[in-house]
């Protein structure tokens, strides 16, 4: 019966957001939120997005369903943006955001016989929940030394022994959340070779294309992996790259042998039908309009370049700080919005209670959430607690 349902604990990040909003201090800083913020602390709508919406408002003739696969032109354009020419051989379906794409992919892997999903840890906190909801077993594979801020490839590849043939592994393509630590091209090759040797299916999570080094640069490693493995699943989110978080724009791509593609598509369609039936259109239509119009595409890329430059500039300023023995200099080499600092629970609590600086309990910070004027205060607060 419904009245017997247990009370679930709130999402830790939502708890932090609530605490920040209720904090009366005017000099507080929210470094926990997972969205991009500009130098003024706002998350603006991109100019190209606004212009595309104007085009859609004037030209759209109907609000009927776009079809179960979704907007095929959107899928083609997003596939080309992420994977280049190889995307023409991928099966694709529009999804309800990146999270929806991850769930679709996990359900597909379960249908194919997978029982476990390896998660290089620490991972995005929602990955394990999605995996469990798909009735798969999430298995952590430690791969990062937070104290030294470096990837441990031996630990990662050694952890592949925890999986069996046909199991999967979720690997973030770029701008790792929560670490900001990306693999080199050579490391991507090593990962691909190790996955092939064990028969593990790569599940690439691409959510921050353009936030690291550039549109093509951010997916260069993932493309290398996809060229070397026979099968793969790829979840794509356009929430961050286009600043359209609430529109829930995602897609799932599957690399499979040609003879298997009809079965892949039929299974994806069945999974989608039982979950949400038809995907939403507005956000995907925005992305399609931007990517298919030369002027809008140029405007979008220019603004994305500005976002990336802002993040890199903040990283350089943080890296120049001296905070006791903390290896702050390595923050400059990390990519995207997030980094995880070597802080314990007591230090995270002290930053929040004594200095009004909010971050997740794991000490993940959103670099883009730190305004330039607040950097000196943040550094001094770190010195006080570290």
What residue ranges belong to the model's regions?
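N-terminal "arm"/small-domain region of PLP-dependent enzymes with the aminotransferase-like
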Residues: 1-66, 80, 274, 280, ...
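Conserved PLP cofactor-binding pocket of PLP-dependent enzymes
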Residues: 30, 330-344, 355-373
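Conserved core of the PLP fold type I
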Residues: 54-55, 61-196, 210-211, 219-227, ...
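Hydrophobic beta-strand scaffold residues
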Residues: 138, 202, 232, 358-359
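Conserved Walker B
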Residues: 206-207
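Active-site PLP attachment segment
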Residues: 221-263
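Structural signature of PLP-dependent enzymes
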Residues: 265-284, 290-319
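Conserved PLP-binding catalytic core of the aspartate aminotransferase-like
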Residues: 300-353
């Amino acid at each position: 019966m419904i009245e017997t349902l247990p009370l679930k604990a709130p999402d830790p990040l939502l708890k932090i957001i609530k605490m920040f909003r209720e904090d009366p201090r005017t000099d507080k800083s929210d470094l926990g939120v997972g969205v991009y913020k500009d130098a003024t602390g706002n998350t603006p709508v991109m100019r190209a997005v606004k212009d595309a919406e104007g085009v859609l408002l004037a030209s759209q003739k109907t609000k009927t369903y776009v079809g179960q696969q979704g907007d095929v032109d959107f899928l083609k354009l997003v596939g080309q943006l992420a994977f280049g020419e190889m995307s023409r051989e991928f099966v694709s379906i529009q999804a309800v955001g990146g999270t929806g794409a991850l769930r679709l992919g996990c359900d597909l892997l379960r249908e194919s016989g997978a029982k476990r999903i390896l998660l290089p840890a620490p991972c995005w906190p929602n990955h394990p929940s999605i995996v469990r909801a798909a009735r798969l077993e999430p298995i952590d594979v430690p791969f990062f030394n937070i104290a030294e801020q470096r990837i441990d490839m031996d630990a990662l590849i050694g952890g592949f022994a925890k999986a069996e043939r046909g199991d999967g592994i979720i690997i973030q393509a770029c701008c790792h959340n929560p670490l900001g630590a990306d693999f080199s091209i050579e490391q991507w090759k090593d990962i691909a070779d190790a996955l092939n040797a064990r028969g593990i299916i790569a599940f690439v999570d691409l959510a921050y294309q353009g936030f690291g080094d550039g549109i093509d640069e951010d997916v260069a490693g993932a493309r290398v992996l996809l060229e070397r493995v026979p099968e793969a699943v790829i979840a794509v989110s356009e929430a961050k790259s286009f600043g359209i978080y609430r529109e829930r724009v995602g897609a799932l791509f599957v690399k499979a042998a040609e003879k298997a593609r009809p079965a892949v598509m039929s299974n994806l369609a069945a999974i989608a039908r039982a979950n949400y039936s038809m995907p939403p259109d507005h956000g995907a239509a925005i992305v399609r309009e931007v990517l298919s119009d030369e002027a809008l595409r140029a405007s979008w890329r220019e603004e994305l370049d500005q976002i990336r430059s802002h993040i890199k500039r903040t990283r350089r300023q943080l890296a120049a700080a001296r905070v006791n023995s903390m290896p702050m200099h390595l923050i400059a080499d990390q990519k995207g919005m997030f980094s995880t600092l070597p802080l314990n629970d007591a230090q995270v609590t002290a930053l929040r209670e004594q200095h009004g600086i909010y971050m997740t309990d794991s000490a993940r910070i959103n670099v883009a959430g730190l305004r330039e004027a607040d950097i000196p205060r943040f550094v001094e607060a770190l010195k006080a607690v570290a």
